[in-house]
Every structure is written in structure tokens, then in C-alpha cells.
Amino acid sequence: MKKFLKYLLVLIILILIAGIVFLFRPIASKQVQTAKDEPVVDAVLVGGGIMSATLGTYFTELEPNWQIRMYERLDQVAQESSNGFNNAGTGHSGFMEMNYTEEKNGKMEIAKAEKVASQFEVAKQFWSYQVKQGVLAEPKTFINPVPHIAFVWGDNVKFLEKRYAAMIQSPLFKGMKFTEDPAVIKQWAPLVMTDRDPTQKVAATRMEVGSDVNYGSITKQLVNHLNQNPNFKLQTSTEVTGISQNDDKTWTVSFKNLKTGKTDHVKTRFVFIGAGGAAVKLLQLTGLPEAKQYAGFPVGGEFLITDNPAITAQHTAKVYGRAELGAPPMSVPHIDTRYIDGKKYVLFGPFATYSNKFLKNGSQLDLLASTNKSNVLLMTTVGLENLDLVKYLVSQVMMSDEDRLNELRKYYPDAKAEDWRLSQGGQRVQIIKKEPGKPATLQFGTEIFASKDGAVTALLGASPGASTSPYIMLNLLEKAFPQQTEGKWNQKLHEIVVSYKQDLSKDPVLLDKVRQYTSSTLGLNYTSPFKAANDETAAAPVAKAN
């Protein structure tokens, strides 16, 4: 027995030593020896998702002569989170997402909902411009009119009524309708009310101008257009293995062809890491001190999905419920109309899953590989401080098929198991961040990372993500290229996004013009709720210069 304990103690000590060695291993990429006369490209985009595609499109319009490179590890673009089946396809506008509004001291706070709504207005303007330029094809190939409905029952009815009363004071939510009449809700969303208990107290709000968006389609169309530019080059099946700074302050991005095994590198003045969940891990390769404050926590999602015409014909809406008290934002249930590649589906979820992968097509070693001496303590601290999230994930992972069906029946009482299949969605990585003088926190939104000189940027986090990609990338341009966005790029940016630098929540006239223009261009449903509606519905509003 003593001999066994001795060996066990030695084994434990060896494991501890190995763990310490692992945590203190070098993370940053080694500097690559490059020739002085080696050509330098203007921008490298890591990842072939909607963020890189959107940023690349901005670049080619602002600087047509720039040399741009895009690297994607899969054999096609838009196969991770941007793929139509890997996300819920919501054009997030704050119309129905009740987690964007909260009641504090008896007052309903709607600022976050206004922020998200304003950002999606930027997205619609960007896509409208691309349609006008012939970059994006027929709008119905990527966006379709689908009303957004917030639906509650029981004690949440009072919350929704207060939310509605607060929201209609903002121009962004004018035209929202509220009802407690089951017959009206049945007209709006028949599936939700079919065979529902008639004694149950229910309420709903509805915004007609809502939409369903296929972000995978947008990504592919943008990249297809980029490929027509001789200054742009896409390499698929190519994994970025290193990002290191050169003595002249340029950067070298090293990569490997996953089909041939060949390695190579490119020198660049600017790097954008738009690799979804893998962004945290890739950012660590830079060795930038600012990158050490980040870690990632991976969470997956599953959806129940049906393409049964008898069901899809009864539902043309995105219906969001309210998360249970204490549940994380990712737990908000919704039953959605989806249009993917010309076919109509109804989707319900999400149901959280857990995996150590940072990407759907990633490795189970991703979480471990991202752990190092700089972030192991903050990861541990955040884990201990978010036991409710851990408990929620465990409860979700333990759900049976019957449990998931019962959740669906809260929103579609007549649901039958044989009509639905379980579909694995994309992988998201929530940010764990430690700022100087502040405790480490787990964050549920998106965040732009920019080095001090703006030469290295990344997008970290998850929702709302894709739906506000044009706004997010515009914000990134401002952080990385402040002189250009204020100077020579300014006029073009106002041409692309008419409301650029304007606060639509405080300018109902401009908001109305913008919504009439984008709705006409994109085929969305919009009836002006303002008395002084602009008569020139389809005409693009005039941009205001800075």
C-alpha cells in the first residue's frame, strides 16, 4: 500500500509539473525571417465568414487598389457560424428580444434595444447599397419579410405591456402593436395558439418590418464579388498557423495548405481575425500584451427543425419568448420561420450543448490550447462566479428528446415528435475578459479588438453578431483607420450608409426615409407610422456630411 501511495504521489507531482510547463509554454508566434524586398499586401482577412466578407467589401469600395488576402481553413466560405443552418437567421432589431430590455426600479430600460435596432438599420443600408451596385443578387436570396413577435403568458404579461408602453415612445419602435386577445395572436402566429389552453393569459407585440436573413448567402455573394477583383485572393483549405510582427512594424501571417501540407507566409500592413470562435486562440499568436486579457468559454446550440409544409404554411413569424428568471441570454426560446436556399423551414430552440471546440469543425483540444498562464486564473474565477450558467448548461445537456418536445409545446402546443428533427447549430465562444483594476467577467455580446496602432484587429464574442456585421465592421474601420474614416473615406461611407454618424433614435424623419428606402430595395414590409411620411418611398435619402 505504501508503495502504491508513493507511486501515486510521484504521478501527481509529475502531472502538476507538466501542467505548469504547459501553462508557461510560449504562445506567441516566432518571428519569421522575411526578405527585405518581399512584397507587402494591404490587408489579410483570417476566416471566410460574414465579418471578413463584409470588411473585404468595405475595403474594395474604399481602396480599390488594395491587395487583400483571405484565408479559410474549410474548403468553402460561410461553413461555420455564418452558415444558414448554424444560426437562427434573425435580423436582430430589438423588436422581440426581451433580454435587450429590463425593468430597473420600476422603469423599463430600452437603450440596449434602441442600440441594436439602430445597428440593424445600418446593416439594411449596407445590403441595399450592395443590391443597387449588383454585388448582392435578388434580395429574396438572402433576406425575407418575417414579422417579429414577442410572446408571453402568465406573470410576464405585465412585463410585456410595460415594455410596449416604453418602446413606442422611441421612433425606432413606432408602429409596434400590442394585444392580449388570443384571436389576434392566432392571426399573427397560428402555430403558437393552436390547441393552447383557452384559460391561459397571453400577450404579444408585433413589428411588421422584421426579417429573416440568410447570412451564409450574403457571405457567399460578397466573396464571389470580391473574387472578381484582381487585387483580391482567397485561399480555402488553408489554416493560419502564426501571426508575428516584423521589425518594420508590418506583420507576417503564416499558413498551411491542409490538402498539400505546404506552408507559406505573407507580409501585411493590416490583419483582421474574423475566425468566429477561433478568434481568441488566433489572437494569442500575436503576442500582443492587449490580447492577454482575453479567454474564451465555448457553448454550442441545437435546434428542432421541420420542413413539413403542413406546419411551415401556418407560421410566418419569428416568435421570441422570455428567458426564465436567472437564465443566461442565450437561453431565450424562439420559434422561427426560416428561408434557406429557397426553402421554408420552422426552427425552435436553442438548446445549449457543451463542447471544448471553439468551432463546429474544430478540435476538442481548442479550449485547452487557448489556456495559458495569463488566463487560467481568470477562467477559473469566472467559472466559480457563474455557477448558474454551469448549472444551466448541465440541465440542457441532460435533456431528453421528450424534454425538448415539451419545451417546443410551450410555443407550439400541437407539436408531434415525428415532424421534427434535432439539428446541431454553430459553436459560439463567449468572451472572458480581465481589464486593469476590474474583476474578470463573462460577456455575452460582441467586442472589437484593436491593437494600439490599429494594425491587428479581431472580432470576439457572439450575439448579435452577423445581423449587425456591417455596423460592427464600420466601427472597426473607425478604430483601425480613424484618419481615413474622418477624411478621404468619409464621403464614400456616407454613400454606402446614408445614416452614418446620425442617431436614428432621435431623428424620426431620417429614420422613416431610411426604412422606406431599405424596405423598398430589400422587399421588406414597412408602412410608415409617422404622420409626415416621405412620399418618395423608393428614393434613397440624401446623406448628411460630417
From Swiss-Prot:
Keywords in alphabetical order:
FAD, Flavoprotein, Oxidoreductase, Tricarboxylic acid cycle
What GO terms describe the biological role, i.e. biological process, of this protein? tricarboxylic acid cycle
Tell me the InterPro entries matching this sequence. FAD/NAD-bd_sf, MQO
Known cofactor(s): FAD
Q: Which GO terms describe its molecular function?
A: 2-hydroxyglutarate dehydrogenase activity; L-malate dehydrogenase (quinone) activity
Which reaction is the catalytic activity of this chain?
A: (S)-malate + a quinone = a quinol + oxaloacetate
**What pathway is this protein a component of?**
Carbohydrate metabolism; tricarboxylic acid cycle; oxaloacetate from (S)-malate (quinone route): step 1/1
What Enzyme Commission number does this protein have?
Answer: 1.1.5.4
Quick check: keyword Flavoprotein in the entry?
A: yes
Pfam families, A to Z: Mqo
Query: What family is it from?
Result: Belongs to the MQO family.
Q: What is this protein called?
A: Probable malate:quinone oxidoreductase
Native organism is: Acinetobacter baumannii (strain AB307-0294)
Lineage, opening ranks: Bacteria, Pseudomonadati, Pseudomonadota, Gammaproteobacteria, Moraxellales
